[in-house]
A protein has these predicted regions:
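Elongated, amphipathic alpha-helical interaction scaffolds
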Residues: 1-184
Length: 186
């Protein structure tokens, strides 16, 4: 996947289409070179029964409405992936990855082809084949030691951000002390 653009407006992308509807704040919103949209969400709590699957439905609707201008044909809707990275097994089946697309109940091999895919990654899962980087990423999310280059880069980035936050706190403490001394005329 070649990424064209990653949006981090104020950490989350907001979609607020109507005054009388609920707004959506997306954790990470990515568009690749083919125009495919990826919405990636981190989930540490299950919420009420059925909440997360229904939230993917709502996010899908809001993303589609945001992408589809008035007068544009429906076949211009882009492929979208809504990905929930979960620190728990939402479905209780011990799979590492659960991928959902709309299928015909009477003919399960018949896919609707609406371009919408929902993926739930399970950091606790042990079943199902995934590539090494994804396996290590899920271990990383679960707080386990991961060996891949990607996981090591993520760990280094987390440490860098932690150091940056510590430096920011130290700077603010020094600055506040300076302000206090300045006011006291020292």
């Amino acid at each position: 996947v070649r990424i064209r653009d990653i949006h981090y407006p104020d950490t989350e992308k907001s979609i607020d289409l109507r005054l009388d509807s609920k707004a959506v704040r997306l954790d990470v919103y990515i568009e690749d070179d083919a125009g495919t949209v990826y919405n990636i969400e981190m989930q540490t709590t299950k919420g009420r029964d059925g909440e997360l699957p229904r939230r993917t439905r709502y996010y899908q609707c809001m993303i589609d409405m945001d992408l589809l201008d008035k007068g544009v044909y429906y076949d211009d809707l882009r492929q979208t992936y809504i990905i929930f990275i979960c620190t728990f097994d939402l479905f209780g089946r011990d799979e590492r990855i659960y991928t959902f697309r709309h299928r015909c109940i009477e003919l399960p091999e018949l896919e609707l082809g609406d371009g919408a895919t929902k993926i739930f990654l399970n950091a606790k899962g042990l079943r199902g084949r995934v590539d090494r980087d994804l396996e290590d990423f899920l271990k990383f999310v679960d707080g386990q030691k991961a060996q891949s280059e990607l996981a090591q880069e993520m760990e280094q980035e987390v440490e860098r951000v932690k150091r940056q936050d510590e430096m920011r706190r130290e700077y603010m403490t020094l600055y506040m002390e300076y302000q206090k001394q300045h006011r006291a005329g020292i």
